[in-house]
């Protein structure tokens, strides 16, 4: 059940506090490439913004050169902030400094400017499914497997 946006496959990303895990698949939903983009939290704000900008360009170019759509999670930040009320202070600080929204906006903007489709999918249990279903079979980390699940959802596969 391919959508027209995923005729050649897709590229899914899982954005984490310290890195972005990328998983590219072919039209059949099989892994073609995995890649990790580190995010350096200790950089100054300007350096971090420049780094995120460069990552956005690199991810967009990856999609454009392969004629593949980008698949991302459609996260609800209001729910996340509500849940932060019940977490330890240190964890809240890490989540607050986490630039997920900033990264996503930069990547989406670059894709829009360069005519690369962005598909948003339900984020429910992507890491859990990736861990339980694919880590052993594929021999990959949870983050790569989460990117794989995100990717497959964007292509219309059900895991």
Predicted regions and their residues:
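Positively charged, helix-rich recognition surfaces that bind polyanionic ligands
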Residues: 1-159
């Amino acid at each position: 059940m391919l959508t027209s946006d995923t005729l050649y496959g897709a590229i899914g990303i899982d954005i984490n506090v310290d890195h972005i895990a990328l998983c590219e698949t072919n039209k059949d939903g099989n892994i073609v490439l995995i890649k990790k983009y580190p995010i350096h939290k200790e950089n100054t704000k300007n350096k971090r913004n420049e780094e995120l900008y460069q990552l956005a360009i690199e991810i967009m170019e990856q999609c454009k050169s392969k004629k593949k759509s980008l698949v991302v999670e459609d996260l609800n930040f209001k729910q996340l902030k509500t849940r932060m009320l019940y977490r330890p202070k240190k964890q809240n600080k890490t989540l607050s400094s986490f630039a997920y929204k900033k990264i996503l906006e930069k990547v989406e903007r670059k894709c829009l400017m360069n005519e690369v489709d962005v598909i948003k999918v339900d984020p429910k249990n992507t890491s859990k499914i990736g861990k339980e279903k694919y880590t052993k079979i594929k021999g990959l980390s949870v983050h790569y497997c989460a990117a794989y699940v995100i990717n497959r959802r964007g292509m219309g596969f059900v895991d």
